[in-house]
């Protein structure tokens, strides 16, 4: 890439952005203005953002007109360090013509690994088993104790079949699954690469032994998984969500787990985040993680560099590597 034609200022919204990303920006002429608050303070951001050329948004607080107004008319671009952008007011960016980037794609392998971990942990009752140990309540003399669901010979269903779902499906090719099915608005042309079958939403619910949610949160998908959906699933099924908590009606999920409508759930995302320690979801058959699907050193650095390169491309008048619109 060519160097930017002049020095430019970049607001970094979080002090823990990967060092290689900061070094890349600085090597190309950026003055980095780093917010120091953890969690990020909106007041600090609003104080430091006026006059910057770019914003590197590395957290999930709302990114909207208030931030853009505070930045000023000289703002040239913004990139989030995230795959999902449900916290961004995209129409506001489009109205103003401000380039917006994000970091999908590079997260797929880390999230896929974690999703399979959740399938196993929830399907085999890891959390409940650990709880029994802590209570000295092992029941190994009971044949049906901790009876779980295994991946072998199971129907694996995906809601959404983009990069993350396909990375999971690729990993499952050697797990002797019965079949892989998925639901999206239209069939994916490359689904044959994963021996996957496009099905209706109802068929996905009815046939899946493991149902993995890996789709964006939109008005169409919000609370797509509710009581009506859970009632169509097998009683032995395992529900896994690595997308966004908002795709699930958590009250209905709690009821489905309490009533035995489904067997278990593995969640890396919830609403809200952090999930309160007194949440009823923590008292039913679950394996819940604190939204850590991308939390590996390799993936975090890759996300950081991609966000930085999105900004550099826009500053240099080139298309962003991963534009959000």
Please report, for each region that a protein language model flagged, where it lies by residue:
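Redox-cofactor binding/interface segments in oxidoreductases and associated redox assembly factors
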Residues: 12, 56-57, 80, 212-213, ...
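A short, aliphatic-rich alpha-helical micro-motif
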Residues: 46-50, 68, 72, 151, ...
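Short glycine-/small-residue-rich Rossmann-like dinucleotide-binding loops
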Residues: 59-60, 83, 209, 215-217, ...
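An N-terminal-biased, well-structured beta-alpha scaffold segment characteristic
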Residues: 2-101, 226
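Short loop/helix-cap segments at secondary-structure boundaries that form the rim of catalytic
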Residues: 21-27, 88-95, 187-194, 276-283
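Rossmann-like dinucleotide-binding domain for NAD(H)/NADP(H)
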Residues: 100, 173, 227, 236-238, ...
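Phosphate-binding beta-alpha-beta segment of Rossmann-like dinucleotide-binding domains, i.e.
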Residues: 98, 104-155, 167-170, 175
């Amino acid at each position: 890439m060519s160097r930017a034609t002049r020095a430019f200022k970049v607001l970094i919204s979080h002090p823990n952005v990967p060092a290689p990303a900061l070094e890349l920006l600085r090597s190309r002429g950026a003055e980095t203005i780093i917010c120091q608050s953890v969690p990020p303070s909106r007041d600090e951001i609003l104080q430091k953002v006026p006059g910057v050329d770019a914003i590197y948004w590395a957290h999930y607080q709302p990114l909207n007109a208030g931030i853009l107004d505070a930045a000023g008319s000289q703002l040239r671009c913004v990139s989030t360090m995230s795959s999902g952008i449900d916290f961004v007011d995209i129409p506001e960016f489009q109205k103003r013509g401000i380039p917006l980037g994000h970091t999908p794609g590079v997260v797929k392998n880390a999230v896929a690994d974690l999703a399979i971990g959740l399938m196993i942990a929830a399907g085999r009752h890891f959390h409940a088993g650990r709880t029994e140990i802590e209570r000295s309540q092992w029941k190994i003399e009971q044949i049906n104790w901790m009876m779980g669901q295994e991946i072998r010979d199971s129907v694996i269903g995906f809601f959404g079949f983009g990069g993350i779902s396909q990375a999971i499906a690729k990993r499952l090719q050697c797990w002797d699954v019965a079949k892989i099915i998925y639901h999206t608005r239209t069939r994916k042309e490359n689904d044959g690469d994963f021996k996957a079958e496009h099905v209706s939403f109802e068929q996905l619910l009815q046939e899946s032994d493991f149902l993995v949610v890996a789709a964006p949160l939109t008005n169409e998908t919000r609370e797509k998984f509710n009581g009506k959906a859970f009632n169509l699933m097998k009683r032995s099924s395992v529900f896994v969500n690595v997308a966004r908590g908002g795709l699930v009606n958590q009250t209905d999920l709690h009821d489905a787990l309490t009533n035995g409508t489904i067997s278990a759930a593995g969640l890396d995302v919830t609403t809200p985040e952090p999930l309160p320690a007194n949440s009823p979801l923590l008292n039913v058959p679950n394996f819940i993680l604190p939204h850590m699907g991308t939390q590996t050193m390799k993936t975090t650095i890759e996300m950081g560099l991609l966000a930085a390169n999105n900004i550099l491309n826009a500053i240099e008048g080139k298309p962003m590597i991963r534009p959000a619109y």
